[in-house]
Amino acid sequence: MNKKLTTTGIIYFLFVFINYSIAQIKENDNTFYVASWNIENLFDTFDNPETNDEDFLPEGDNQWTEDRFQHKLGNLAKVINYMNDGCGPDVIGLLEVENINVIKWLIYKFKDRDYIIAHRDSPDQRGIDAALIFDRNVFGIVDIDTIRVNIPTGIPTRYILHVTLKFLRDNSIIHFFVNHWPSRRGGEAKSEPNRIAAAKTLMEYLEKLFDEDKKSRIILLGDFNDEPDNRSIIQILGAKDFDCDSTKNEIGLLNLSYKSKTKGEGSYLFGSAWNMIDQIIISSSLKDGKDIEYICNSFSVIKPEFMVSKEGSRKDGPLPTYSGNRYIGGYSDHFPVGAKFILLKEK
């Protein structure tokens, strides 16, 4: 019995020590890690009569049961914990969440992080929204806003979520915009005007921020359903590729994802082609050598080995939850992306 108590005591000590150590690391750390992930249809198992969620019910086409929901939560948590060298992200944008409750279930999985949820319901017909979760020991909440996107088809689409956070190390204000632009359903060319509309709407909002403060710190993240060299990104937003060693005189938006695209990498496998549709874009004020700074070459597509499909048509791609209506039991049909930032000097 004493041996059992001793073993239990050791396990408890290790649990407390690990949690304390991570907290201490963050307290003395001038960096923060930002991630973005389309988590592929995180629905609960209850019917929402106001949305088209019938496929994701126990009796629906996908036979979405409580066991499958809980398995999905565990898989998502495994990938999120893997990020940032096993410490998890300090802030992460999540796409394709049905409601705030499914995010609450997800963050219960993280015992060594104190995540807070920023979320608003959107008018998307399927009921999927964008959300942001952040560690309250690293960031404080300033404001949450939504940006309505009106597209040419007139079909209600997802809001862009604008979350203003304060980095607690020096009280710097950072604007996070979580995007899930209209899909390519019907074909890339035919659906492009919808994403152009989203880009124009976002750009109008950003211009107001820059008018108020040309040094506004801005991080755009999400699933844009367009690539870095598509018109909506490169022309409307003006988010360009850049040389990490010579950006002090750059103005506007810098696309951290661009080089990955030119290297043939991607976050989403469409047929046999990689698409870099999950992106992180920053204002040039985060690469000017002052205060908060993007750490050069820290952007990456996050591809843990356990998440990579080993066979079939999706070989080397992300292992999804579903392939059509066939249950796979994986993680998501998108790989996450992430990048790291550092506070060069405290105010």
Task: Report the location of each language-model feature.
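N-terminal, active-site-proximal structural segment of metallo-dependent hydrolase catalytic domains
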Residues: 21-112, 122-128, 310-318, 342-347
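Active-site beta-strand/loop signature of hydrolases that rely on acidic residues for catalysis
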Residues: 34-39, 64, 69-72, 76-103, ...
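Metal-dependent phosphoester-hydrolase catalytic domains
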Residues: 24-26, 204, 208-218, 226-347
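Bacterial Sec-dependent N-terminal signal peptides
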Residues: 1-27
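Structured beta-strand-rich core segments of catalytic domains in phosphoester-bond hydrolases
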Residues: 39, 91, 97-182
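Second-shell loop/turn segments in exported
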Residues: 60-67, 88-94, 119-120, 149-151, ...
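Active-site His/acidic residue clusters
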Residues: 50-53, 176-191
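Extracytoplasmic/secreted cell-surface and envelope-processing proteins
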Residues: 44, 101-104, 126-129, 185-188, ...
